[in-house]
Amino acid sequence: MSAIYLLRKISTKTPSRFHRSLFFSTFSKDSPPDLSRTTSIRHLSSSQRFVSSSIYCFPQSKILPNRFSEKTTGISVRQFSTSVETNLSDKSFERIHVQSDAILERIHKNEEEVETVSIGSEKVVREESEAEKEAWRILENAVVRYCGSPVGTVAANDPGDKMPLNYDQVFIRDFVPSALAFLLKGEGDIVRNFLLHTLQLQSWEKTVDCYSPGQGLMPASFKVRTVALDENTTEEVLDPDFGESAIGRVAPVDSGLWWIILLRAYGKITGDFSLQERIDVQTGIKLIMNLCLADGFDMFPTLLVTDGSCMIDRRMGIHGHPLEIQSLFYSALRCSREMLSVNDSSKDLVRAINNRLSALSFHIREYYWVDIKKINEIYRYKTEEYSTDATNKFNIYPEQIPPWLMDWIPEQGGYLLGNLQPAHMDFRFFTLGNFWSIVSSLATPKQNEAILNLIEAKWDDIIGNMPLKICYPALEYDDWRIITGSDPKNTPWSYHNSGSWPTLLWQFTLACMKMGRPELAEKALAVAEKRLLADRWPEYYDTRSGKFIGKQSRLYQTWTVAGFLTSKLLLANPEMASLLFWEEDYELLDICACGLRKSDRKKCSRVAAKTQILVR
């Protein structure tokens, strides 16, 4: 831990990038930060100490109540922080200037906000709706400051909530749509600060019952706390949660994956690649990848995780190889391959990433895909096959096909399974995993089309009165009692058990725009916009059609607001949206490390994956 910390602290030189010409970061020419202003934890009394992973600085500040572009008094983190570079530009948060063919400006005119979209020489002026104006106010009020600089947004900022629990913390997964909204608005400092501060938290000690998880683990969330040093002096500290305080004490597997995805998005949108080229950032990427690619007992290229290790953070029967984790894992692998500098210390890791990408894409495309043809194939499966050429490789019993699926799946649609393990297929439709399979090209082009066809055909089930179902259908009766343990929060058609989550809008929008079907996203966004403002931006909605606000739903949920705004900005800026998704990588189909083509076996992942592209 100390070696990694020292490396990040002294790193001043950036390595060359892979797939691009040399590009070196520009560091501040000012005098170095005054680190004497910081205070070590050992100076605090035992009653004042927090967890050992806390980071300290001045002055006292937490949530910024107004627009955080306004000047504040006190010492800025730029003067002495080791994790945030000095000499950052003070961008106005009243204006956007996106460097692309489409230029979006947000100006104040007669106290009304107007959006100007310039495409070529044509200009179209569109006044922001009341919902958009309110959403920006809520998002900006949710910003958290640390040492005078914005570092994230709280999960929810409901003034009527007397017991916020951990909703007053900055969650990595929750901040992603907020970060994209700010980036698309031309405000990158908050995202840069967030990435660097969470990177420092990565290498700090985390322990549950005297056991420490992998070194590359990113926290699920962090909180800015203020501690008193004496009667007149206070100090701010970053207090991370790696799962030791979470319900069920589950490590956040998706946090590191989201961090890598956001790091790439920051570079793509801002054009500032110096951040990802820093030695400490390169080290952070390697730690996450090494943790994900570590050898184990698993026979599959998918990541093996426990229940509750992602957005669905309560017991919902997704332990094993859930699609959400696999699609984010695949995206993070592609991001890492793009951002890692190739040298003697990283070439083995890059080779391992390439091999894993090839194996993972084949595995998901071949075994997770479900359409009417595949269901009929499973329906006729023979079981107990013992052979390398077995058709039913996972020994799936046809009786596992749920009755609802037979009549539900459309003729022209399909989707990726929620989970796959020996003798087990989870036939539920999980939206986030399927959306990111489209965005990252984990699924084939024809599979991507079929997923959107299914959503269009089953609009009332997936969208209903509020987009979008987190999964479909709900676990009910004995399934709910056995699989969730009778969880009172995950009752049928509520919360993670097929509740409707508006934050998923931005991911649906990105998937639709990639496939050239933005009208689907616009239709869903129109459904949400009718209700979100009046309902005070709830976290989730209940009932089969999403008609009621969730029974335990927090109001003024930040990622609900951010998901709505990001969807609006993506639709208005298709050039920017194109920076956030991946096209099919045909080079991956030529990578095969298994050596099966030299044996008597009939199929290897390279040949089979190419068949998936050209035939399906």
Curated annotation (Swiss-Prot):
Coiled-coil region list:
none
Q: Which organism is it from?
A: Arabidopsis thaliana (Mouse-ear cress)
Phenotype of null mutants: Reduced primary root length and number of lateral roots. Reduced plant growth, delayed flowering, increased expression of antioxidant genes under basal conditions and reduced oxygen consumption in the dark.
Q: What is this protein identified as?
A: Alkaline/neutral invertase A, mitochondrial
Q: In which tissues is it expressed?
A: Expressed in seedlings, roots and flowers.
Its biological function? Mitochondrial invertase that cleaves sucrose into glucose and fructose and is involved in the regulation of multiple tissue development and floral transition. May generate glucose as a substrate for mitochondria-associated hexokinase, contributing to mitochondrial reactive oxygen species homeostasis.
The gene for this chain is: INVA
Q: How does activity depend on pH?
A: Optimum pH is 9.5.
| Keyword Mitochondrion carried by entry | yes
Print the organism lineage: Eukaryota, Viridiplantae, Streptophyta, Embryophyta, Tracheophyta
